[in-house]
């Protein structure tokens, strides 16, 4: 019954119309649109008004809208695509929040001091984006943000024992990731059809710390039972009861939508930001192309919050800022992640930082769809290694994906390593899935397309993929010897709990190591993909955008991948993208509420 009270999603014309209109309308033809915060314009005539204008509908945008409602601030969310959720909806949906209420409830011994020690060891000196003030603001407000969500009805959980990505560092021994519990998407009615879909959307309602169990379900009775419970009771069982169970990033977005819909939730879809409106050095609103039909001047009485992602899909910006080779074809970010909001922010003299960085991760490309597949688990499982063009290993394959991506670029400066090759034997293919291929089955189409190369000998495999056969053979032999002893003397693979988390405990003496010894052997190209870019607008501890003057631009806030990350060039743990995004959007709204700027 409650669902009938919710407004139905508005219908708008197609996204192509937005691009068409945007190409026809010169932003500078509108006198109200300032090119710098110093430009004065006191005669703007606005078409719409709100307290807070939120640009972007991912986790950060929806969390900000909810906070606005709770603080009696009227908000308007504008989303340039026809779908809600951004890259958040495509993600695992985890939030890395130290000292959080869910961890405390299960007895975790964490503190701000402990987490700061860990962050400092991970991040080091990464410039003003990761300043001491911003680190502390994040650590103090992350738990408050989660407590606020719980007060609003959010149902979350600690993500099992999902470890930090560098558990061996001081302060790294306490798991800190939180995620939403299984959510019934039927609660939001027709709005669920507007949530962005991605590769993870078709998965059963699994939690982030359970994904490894699905991968190992063919090798372990306990994991098989766990997988059966996930797919059966939690999945089919709930569907039989008329539910639509969702988890991960899609579940997070659906639950945040549900909480927003309890309030007066205002969102314009297919309504991209065209420019910011500045009066007397203060951002007072924006020009929005509403529904692709006409430019609308929206006054933001209290502030504008930019939370519309990064520039992972923008080829020109990637070539301008990122190390070569780079391409948007390797990213897992959604197709609208074009950096337009960063460019518009830069147009009002905002500083940029960390523009050369991203949330890296080894990926393979599906030859049929052209879409990347992020190698989170495959490279941590036994009976696999990654080699460069010379046939040699160059990293701990099981380590944090961000570090692994960085190492691919570092290696490539000396030895061609883009693409690298992941080498598997039949033990790996028999026991574990690889991307979308189930255990024991390698489709002929995958072989025919060249996605995966197969051979009965390592020498022939090396010749097929163009690497030095002797080096590959020597590398495999040495790796096998170390695997049998259980110690990777070259790169330390399997030496910490994160490496082991996605390994196979059935393999002894080290669940992340296993000889490559059983033919046929396989090879797949590996590229330095990413989950999105890490650089953007420079912000302070209040999420205010910093101008080139070194001072905050009044009225302008930003969070998430639109900004330079508080994590610097590091990735401390699962959810270290979404956690800060939602925390700093929470901080932004709090600052807006306290300051009548």
Where are these regions (language model features)?
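N-terminal chloroplast transit peptides
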Residues: 1-17
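Generic low-complexity segments that are intrinsically disordered, proline-rich and/or Lys/Arg-biased
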Residues: 8-10, 21-23, 38, 164, ...
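Residues forming the flavin
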Residues: 22-113, 176-179, 183, 189-597
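Dinucleotide-binding Rossmann-like beta1-alpha1 core, especially the glycine-rich loop
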Residues: 102-106, 110-193, 197, 201
